[in-house]
Amino acid sequence: MADGVVIVDKPAGWTSHDVVARVRRLAGTRRVGHAGTLDPMATGVLVVGVGKATRLLGYLALTEKVYEATIRLGQSTTTDDAEGELLERRPADHIDEAAVHAGTRALTGVIHQVPPQVSAVKVRGQRAYRRARAGETVELKAREVTVHEFTVTGFRRVDSPDGAFVDVDARVTCSSGTYIRSLARDLGADLGVGGHLTALRRTRVGPYTVEQAATLDELAAEFTVMPLAEAVAAAFPVRRLSAGEARRVVHGHRISPSGHSGPVGLFAPDGRVLALAENRSGSSQPVVVFAGS
């Protein structure tokens, strides 16, 4: 079993757990996990850790994400995406492109966002989606997230027997924990017509891009893993250790602080990745030790 990261281009209709189950079979190990859920409707980058790389996943989940989304204005749904039941329909033919641009600007920066009722957020110890599917009205608290970019890339009017709608294509760069479904819902609400997400593709998680991703069919034909050292060096600053520092780190001991505020990859003189470390109380503390694990 190779330790490392697999960048999967998740197909529509698959849950993130479905992908993990398939990678477990391909890798021949149950020591597999992912670094952040994609909804079944969504496609694109799902970062999967194999072996020792599963210990990276909690840190990779906190990295910046990039999405390409399509939002329909004029319809709201129970799930804030196309998978839910229609709640309300309002004419959107009066909405122009300038109003949409103003709406996306208002949702850019540090914002307080309420997650969708059908989401993995825990409410009193149970996932919100389980409560919602049981018929319970879920009260979710707003959470602070950062939307670095919410750019309109397409604007189309849609006239159908169901009404007059607007479809908006957008690119979103955001912090961990941001729900694109909530952005779609809130953009529609701010414009007074309601909105929901009709398509979503994640194109980047931290440093890992969709251009690097493999489909499940490609992985079945040739299962390739990004080696652990390469995966760490791509995602975090690298610190090269002396032999003495490396010995201390392998045993989980502190070393002198690094010049970085976040996690740093610690590498032995021979190029092996030994650990992730963070500065704590004036020294660099290993928080994940790979050597010997």
Curated annotation (Swiss-Prot):
EC number(s) given by UniProt: 5.4.99.25
Alphabetic keyword roster: Isomerase, tRNA processing
GO biological process: mRNA pseudouridine synthesis; tRNA pseudouridine synthesis
InterPro entries per record: PsdUridine_synth_cat_dom_sf (IPR020103), PsdUridine_synth_N (IPR002501), PUA-like_sf (IPR015947), PUA_sf (IPR036974), tRNA_psdUridine_synth_fam2_C (IPR015225), tRNA_psdUridine_synth_TruB (IPR014780), TruB_C (IPR032819)
GO molecular function: RNA binding; tRNA pseudouridine(55) synthase activity
Gene3D superfamilies with a match to the protein in the record: Pseudouridine synthase, PUA domain
CDD domains, A to Z: PseudoU_synth_EcTruB
A Pfam family recorded for this sequence: TruB_C
Reaction(s) this enzyme catalyzes, per UniProt: uridine(55) in tRNA = pseudouridine(55) in tRNA
EC class: isomerase
PANTHER family per record: PSEUDOURIDYLATE SYNTHASE TRUB1, TRNA-PSEUDOURIDINE SYNTHASE
Described function: Responsible for synthesis of pseudouridine from uracil-55 in the psi GC loop of transfer RNAs.
Record family assignment: Belongs to the pseudouridine synthase TruB family. Type 1 subfamily.
This protein's name: tRNA pseudouridine synthase B
Organism: Thermobifida fusca (strain YX)
